[in-house]
Amino acid sequence: MKKLNFIIVVIGALASCKGTDVGNPPIDFSVVPVQTVEGMVARRFERDNLTYDMRAGRMERFEYKDEDGTPQEYELYSGGFEVLGYSADGLLETQINADGARHNTVAGQEQWLAFGNVHIQNHTKGEHSLTDTIYWDRAAKKIHTDCFIQMYSPQGLMQGYGMESDEKAENAIIRHPFDSYGIDRDSTWFYFDSVNFVGPLQRF
């Protein structure tokens, strides 16, 4: 049986109540958060192994019903957003940084997106990408964007519009590439993962 633990560490949490004072107009919870968290850190575990770290300068949670009476829920992250993804061996594999993010929940369906100066890095492969908005399908374990994207790797640069990849950014594919540049390297070159490096560097 798959064991899933989710631990949230909160620094300086402020929560607002849904009640209203007598004589005051009702609060519009579509614009007023029901919860605010400053300096949020979240950790996700699977089978007792750390899989994700998530950090944000500020998180605001909104809960309300739209004009049709449909419940709406979302969390808005601002002040910087970061997700760190780890491999089964505990290595820092993927890093996503952005200006902000949003987590929507509508009729039980989830949607994650990060926006503003999005930087996606795969440290084990030495690859990183730059774009404006990235979407994460947590159930399918995939990420994608429809925006302009630049992808850098030890082999060179590729750029275009639209990208699809697994959530670890290991097999990213640009849907509509229009430009690329290659790098010629000699046979002695190799990629060195300095992020996960432990111990002296050995060359044979």
PLM segments and residue spans:
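Mature-chain termini and adjacent capping regions
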Residues: 1-204
